[in-house]
Amino acid sequence: MNTQLQDALITQAEGHAAALTKYRGAATAARFSDPRTEFDGLRTGCGVYDLGFRAKISLTGDDRVRWLNGMVTNNIRDLAQGHGVYAFLLNPQGRILGDMVAYNLGESLLVDTDRGQVEKILATFDHYIIMDDVEVENLSDKLTAVGVRGPSSRAILQGAGLKIPELMPLQTFSLQCDCECGCMDCTIVRGEDPAHEEYEIWVAPQFVEQLWKALLAAGATPVGAEALEMDRIASGIPLYGVDIRERDLPQETEQARALNFSKGCYVGQEIVERIRSRGNVHRKFIGFVSQNGAPITVGAKVMIGDAAGEKEVGEITSATTLALQSIALGYIRREHAIPHKEVTIAGEKAWVAALPFAEAGSLVSEPDRKPAIQEA
């Protein structure tokens, strides 16, 4: 976490003993109040949160576009200036080494990933740059970010002096903010989900505390890592290192947004194309809902069967509790990936659920009713 922001976050954490926590490779605030209240702010108002756990890598040089296009699973070659795409970095066996959002900033490409992944990604980049005109620079100590999410996000940005046009998902917009806390250059990025208002604000580290204060003054609710994790799981978004591991294949993760099948060759592409042409993988990423509200444990096995015996068909990778309902993310064998199918997790009955989950308030806990789940 940026040190300029750290003291401000500790002060605002309302005396909680665990004010700071390690989240996605960086120290950040665990909570500012009740995480359920913070989660509600993300869903019904506007939450503001530290994005110091994200790392930024710059790619320059004449070969940068061709080279990165040959490294990742999405189309960098045709990426318009000021836009980004989500992508995987694979090994030659088609397994996932990391995930990222790659942006075309004109004179450079910018790779945005978690700090917990940055060293592996940098090492992989270094290994594959041979005679290419590509320069790689880790900007993580020169560029940091704050995020806002919720239906009031655009109004909060404007209230903080950040007036932006309508942006497409993963589109960037650079401006100079002249707010009560001072003047700063920043870049605003629209979130990937077009159904939700979500923005990242990239600034130099020396400006991040005043940006934070300006957003709070405009009416945003401060949100810590615990509520962010609740929101991530409710949104059905897998996290690398937790839900996506190096042993996983791209199609198993159900993240079609990361794949482009017409872009040409890249590291691991042969395996990805073979899966596409020959049929589906044996398991898929999906959601689970407890029937009686019993907590679901990360690492638990997903079972099906009857009195005659049970068999393992999946695993839990992330879990949380919302509105008295326990929900989870994980993998299940494809033939059992049917919304509302009954399974057993650690001896408790649960349902398979399509992703993303419905809004938390509509999830039900009665064991004799099926959960209100949005179809994928």
Put a short name on every predicted segment.
Residues D63-L68, V118-I121, S153-L157, F207-A214, ...:
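Short, conserved charged micro-motifs
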Residues N2, M100, L249, T253-L259, ...:
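Glycine-rich, small/acidic residue-mixed loop/short-helix segments
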Residues P35-T44, H83, A87-D99, I129-D132, ...:
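Short amphipathic beta-strand starts and helix->beta connectors
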Residues G47, K56, D78-L79, V101-R232, ...:
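Acidic, low-complexity central loop/insert segments
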Residues M1-Y86, L90, R95-L97, A376:
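Acidic, proline/glycine-enriched N-terminal capping motif
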Residues Q81-H83, P165-D178, G236, G241, ...:
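Glycine-centered loop/turn motifs
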Residues G61, V111, V148-G150, I201, ...:
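Residue-level signal for inorganic ion chemistry
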Residues W202-V289:
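Anionic-ligand-binding alpha/beta catalytic cores of soluble enzymes and soluble regulatory domains
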